[in-house]
Amino acid sequence: MILNLIILLAISIVASASNIAAYWGQNAGGDQQTLGDYCSSSPASIIILSFLDGFPNLSLNFANQCSGTFSSGLAHCSQIGSDIKSCQQQGKTILLSLGGATGNYGFSSDSEAVQFAGTLWNKFGGGKDSERPFDDAIVDGFDFDIENKDQTGYAALATQLRKYFSTGTKSYYLSAAPQCPYPDESVGDLMSQVDLDFAFIQFYNNYCSLNQQFNWNSWSNYARGKSIKLYLGLPGSSSSAGSGFVGLSTVQRVVASIKGDSSFGGISIWDISSAENGGYLNQLHQALSGSGSPAAPSNSYQPNTPLTRTYGGSTATASAYISVGFTAGATHGSTTTNDLLAWIDSLFGSSQSSVQQYATPVQSVTATPQPVAATTTSAPKPTASAFNWFGWFDGTTTSTTLQTVYSTVPADQTVYVTLTTTVGSQMLQSLFDKRDVIAEAKSTNLQICWLLFIPLLALICS
């Protein structure tokens, strides 16, 4: 009874909602360091070794981190074994993941899977074997990252492992890494038939990622009445997954919406080598702990950001997707012909107000709806309906300031705004639309007497 209480307490500590679980071993970031380095420097409390990618005929793959072998050809990773013990001394939980997106693995029957449970226990757990890839280091459990849609034997394997765990003197854990569509096609049976401790749900490379049809509620309903903790699985960078990488502000928003769920355990990352680059892992840790402020990538903006421009003395505001080419908080100036027009007008006895009376300010500015797929082509160059006079005259400068906003689209996507400007005149009763044109109302107010000034100007210049 006391042992069971200790195990439950250990699980509750490991499954704290501020936890980060990180996969290590496949070098997704391109500069993978040793397991010990990440245990010492990262906030991850659970690190999953990936992968045992071949079974029942054993095969291990840790990219650039293990080159030794036994005489049988099985990988012998003494440094990883030493790091496992060091990590555990620092309070880290170390799991060994079975499967992966590629590999030669699977069972022909439940009986074969039950037999393989003994192999796992003896080579990586509390059992004994002459060839232990991590020497005397003992992992804290096993993760099922099965992705080949063959579910044969995994429930039987997990059930048998639980029996071995009960004979040990420490806490052991079982986890799964399902894709976010529910139920998962590769570990759905395992998750419905066996009590697991964690689920590192892959909310990427699918339609149910955080910035699409996020389906946390489906998984929360599955976890109801169970002791399992659900992790928000994210890619560590845009290059470590085909799709689904999101900025910190999106993560903060989602975490705020689900952190009250008793089944929420934290965030899981694929993988730690990519998430360490740029400090993303530490930012996620701050998001979970509630500290820190939203990051504002300089080349990405969220939708529905107010955009205000002033035309002919009137101001129009619209909500739009802003081109990633802008910089938050920057001021962009443009030269107008207001002073020039006023000066010419005064030569003929007209006042500024007489010019202004013909100007109908912009009536509406509308934004193009969010595109289904962000464009990656160059931004269209808008044309202007007013002359800039090559800076010869002392024109006034109007400016537009974009407020600082936070990203809800991946930084590597480019989104453009299309403004529809309606310009009217008392001399033209019908209204007309112009797309991709930012027009100044002054440009519609050219009085016929000004045409006399053009030959005079040409004569002076000659």
From Swiss-Prot:
It catalyses: Random endo-hydrolysis of N-acetyl-beta-D-glucosaminide (1->4)-beta-linkages in chitin and chitodextrins. Induction: Transcription is greater during growth of the yeast form as compared to the mycelial form and up-regulated by micafungin treatment. Residues 1-17 form the signal peptide. Residues 18-291 form the GH18 domain. It is found in: Secreted. PROSITE patterns: GH18_1 (PS01095), GH18_2 (PS51910). It comes from the Eukaryota. PANTHER family: ENDOCHITINASE. This is Chitinase 1. It comes from Candida albicans (strain SC5314 / ATCC MYA-2876). The lineage of its organism: Eukaryota, Fungi, Dikarya, Ascomycota, Saccharomycotina. The gene is CHT1.
